[in-house]
Amino acid sequence: MWHWHRFQEHEARRSDAIVLLRKIMSNESKSNSLYAFESLESNVRFYSRSFPVVFEKAAGAILHDESGREFIDFLSGSGVLNYGHNDPYFLDEATQYLRSNGIIHGLDMATPAKREFMECFDAIILRPRGLTYKFQFCGPTGANAVEAALKLARKATGRHSIVSFTNGFHGMSLGALAVTGNRYYRDAAGFPPAGVAFMPYDGYWGADNDTSEYLDKVLADASSGVDVPAAIILETVQGEGGINAARKEWLQSIQRICRSHGILLIVDDIQAGCGRAGNFFSFEFAGLSPDVVVLSKSISGCGLPLSLLLLKPELDVWRPGEHNGTFRGNNLAFVTGAAALRKYWTNDALSARVMETGRIIAERLRQVAQTNRARSLSVRGRGMMLGLNCGTGKLAERIVRKAFEEGLVVERCGAEDQVIKLLPPLTTDEQTLRRGLDILHKSVAASI
């Protein structure tokens, strides 16, 4: 009898599951229902809380939810979609590759797709800039590439400590988290990350204080308590840290300090690179020559996972397989990444467009700040990586929520989430850009 009841319970559950599956397959569960996400997905989910609709389609700078409502995207996958959603050329290249039975997963084996990506990158990006780097393909996330960069720096120099900066953000895995400044993320590690000394970023002590002088002094002083590190890691524009843009002179000073102390310079260009700050590399305007460059996010062109290191040849001290990962050979991402290089980077047109569009956005943000002088709003950033500092996280949250209600997707950043971060696709047309800025302007006015 007991077994019969168990059988009946099993059959009842099976019947319920079949009914639910049929409902899912018949689309009855759709129309922007978030029930599945709220009931099945972990509490760690984030963006679906900020933007509580089900996004279904996208093209360029426009998103559509399941009900067909349109949203202007000034988030771009947090910097992944510099060229917008679903570029037709990228999709065509990817589709042709898939139909040809091209290798999709290949570990780090030699494939035509990887060869073409490296050759395109070398010919289009590196050689015209007088740069010589070797490629290291890491796991699919930027954090994994940061891990590889830190490991390589320690292996190449024989030193162990790393210098990072206040408000820096480099990823969520333990090594990357150790060089990340934000306490909210660091606390989630469960133990205090070690081996990192944090120094004040440019402007941290105000515009009149050159924090690089402090760094130079403590490194030169054997009694400062700060060891000469294996590497200094930095973002030239801090994204998650609040759109803090370092001055050219400060960056050049950091590079001089690295050279004088035999320290490797790692530039994390995961978010600021691939044209977001103007040039392909965000450090070009300062004339830097980093020892290691970390790239991810927009490097694949259309949102496919890909990350890599660019390292100077003399630093290639790895033994075979010493840093590996199952998904370090995303060949479809190589295909779309090469397509992006061919389409956008064989001349300076996109860089010029980014700088001009950035000026338009910055001027509009200054108008917003001027209109609301009582709240001491301010504008920050470079290129099309810009932010509106609202002073408090609560005000920024109200503005972002109102903007979403009006059809604009934009997020917050900074230590207190007090900065509204604008990352529209670099290819956004003027009409869409102005519509988005109009919504933001109205949302600020309605929230103050």
UniProtKB/Swiss-Prot annotation:
Signal peptide: none annotated. Keywords: Aminotransferase, Plasmid, Pyridoxal phosphate, Transferase. GO terms for molecular function: diaminobutyrate-pyruvate transaminase activity; pyridoxal phosphate binding. PROSITE patterns: AA_TRANSFER_CLASS_3. The keyword Transferase applies. It comes from the Bacteria. InterPro entries: Aminotrans_3, Aminotrans_3_PPA_site, Dat, Ectoine_EctB, PyrdxlP-dep_Trfase, PyrdxlP-dep_Trfase_major, PyrdxlP-dep_Trfase_small. The modification N6-(pyridoxal phosphate)lysine is found at K297. One of its GO terms (biological process) is ectoine biosynthetic process. Its EC number is 2.6.1.-. Coiled coil: none annotated. Its cofactor is pyridoxal 5'-phosphate. PANTHER family: DIAMINOBUTYRATE--2-OXOGLUTARATE AMINOTRANSFERASE, DIAMINOBUTYRATE--2-OXOGLUTARATE TRANSAMINASE. Belongs to the class-III pyridoxal-phosphate-dependent aminotransferase family. This is Uncharacterized aminotransferase y4qG. It comes from Sinorhizobium fredii (strain NBRC 101917 / NGR234).
